[in-house]
Amino acid sequence: MKLDQVARSLLLKEFVSGFFLAMKYFLKPKATINYPFEMGHRGPRFRGEHALRRYPNGEERCIACKLCEAICPAQAITIEAGPRRNDGTRRTTRYDIDMVKCIYCGMCQEACPVDAIVEGPNFEFSVETREELLYDKQKLLENGDRWEREIARNIAIDAPYR
């Protein structure tokens, strides 16, 4: 037994096997991405910054049903509905999301019957003050207008599974 230990220490078997293992991984392509310059793949169900969508004619989709407000586990959504219009529909006068409270669970998006509130593809929305994370209706509509093409594509891809 002692002779075996002496042979291993003289031949540095562990060192050589570790060196070859390191060289094996050293020569493989890198698994990481250079983040600010390269963007990783985001799937169609990615939950990023919230957005309110519009119909192609420019009218907002939200019908003030308040399902998203009711289902939000963090109670981050506040909606106030205006009076009924001549055609019997309602629209929101106030639609606020407190992004500090939001846990990005996606339940608001799942509850919406008209796909008005969605969690878009944007995840880079750092701010300097907490007040900037209180999204009002105008900010949410701007997000929807900015990301509409990608949001519509992601919803179309995900449609068979909904």
From Swiss-Prot:
Signal peptide: none annotated. Keywords: 4Fe-4S, Cell inner membrane, Cell membrane, Iron, Iron-sulfur, Membrane, Metal-binding, NAD, Quinone, Repeat, Translocase, Ubiquinone. [4Fe-4S] cluster 2 binds at C72, C102, C105, C108. InterPro entries: 4Fe4S_Fe-S-bd, 4Fe4S_Fe_S_CS, NADH_quinone_OxRdtase_chainI. SUPFAM superfamilies: 4Fe-4S ferredoxins. [4Fe-4S] cluster 1 binds at C62, C65, C68, C112. Binds 2 [4Fe-4S] clusters per subunit. It is found in: Cell inner membrane. Residues 52-82, 93-122 form the 4Fe-4S ferredoxin-type domain. It is a peripheral membrane protein. It catalyses: a quinone + NADH + 5 H(+)(in) = a quinol + NAD(+) + 4 H(+)(out). GO terms for biological process: aerobic respiration. One of its GO terms (cellular component) is plasma membrane. Its EC number is 7.1.1.-. The keyword Repressor does not apply. Its cofactor is [4Fe-4S] cluster. PROSITE patterns: 4FE4S_FER_1, 4FE4S_FER_2. GO terms for molecular function: 4 iron, 4 sulfur cluster binding; iron ion binding; NADH:ubiquinone reductase (non-electrogenic) activity; quinone binding. Its main location: membrane. The keyword Repeat applies. NDH-1 shuttles electrons from NADH, via FMN and iron-sulfur (Fe-S) centers, to quinones in the respiratory chain. The immediate electron acceptor for the enzyme in this species is believed to be ubiquinone. Couples the redox reaction to proton translocation (for every two electrons transferred, four hydrogen ions are translocated across the cytoplasmic membrane), and thus conserves the redox energy in a proton gradient. NCBIfam families: NuoI (TIGR01971), PRK05888.1-4 (NF004538), PRK05888.1-5 (NF004539). Belongs to the complex I 23 kDa subunit family. NDH-1 is composed of 14 different subunits. Subunits NuoA, H, J, K, L, M, N constitute the membrane sector of the complex. This is NADH-quinone oxidoreductase subunit I. It comes from Methylorubrum populi (strain ATCC BAA-705 / NCIMB 13946 / BJ001). The gene is nuoI.
